Amino acid sequence: MRETEVTRKTNETDITLRLGLPDLTRDGVVGIIDETARVMEIYTGVPFFDHMLHAMFFHGGFSVDLRAVGDVEIDDHHTVEDVGIVIGTALREAVELHGPVRRFGHSVVPMDDALGEVVVDAGGRSYLVYQATYPQDRAGRFDLSLVREFFQGLSSQGRINMHVLGRYGDNGHHLAEALFKAAGRALGSAFLPRETVASTKGVL
């Protein structure tokens, strides 16, 4: 398994992540070849965010052990943003450690009334396009405006061009979940291994 570990500690958050990148399994599915080695442990202190991250990593075929302690007694913002930063850092470092990836990924995912679409280019250029209008401000106690902050942190530190598009939805929870699942599937495809660099320049 292509793995990387990242630790980030600030005055606001303390985060550790061990991330395993997906491969193509024997039956052509994006995932961990040795399923017994796959870990799905996520704890950020923000339950709804944990749920979204689990959906993202599960459907992307990743293995993940993520632990975050943040100042959630003040606000969830620092934890959500910093987790995005750490995940982006791990993805970037995984490429540096383990070699070229396929680079591009695209996924459209429905969740009942909602439809989410995510397109990624892991080509070394950070840029986020985020278009999502939530019919409610919150999903339970979670501020849905923080979804953008998460993807901004992931995109910037991962040096990934991401287009995160909430096409429509009547339920904020469903729309956010569709976006996280689509992001996982798009990232899983983009970070599959390949033998040569996916660029006419020869480098990323």
Give a label for each model feature.
Residues 1-204:
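N-terminal intrinsically disordered, cationic/polar leader segments
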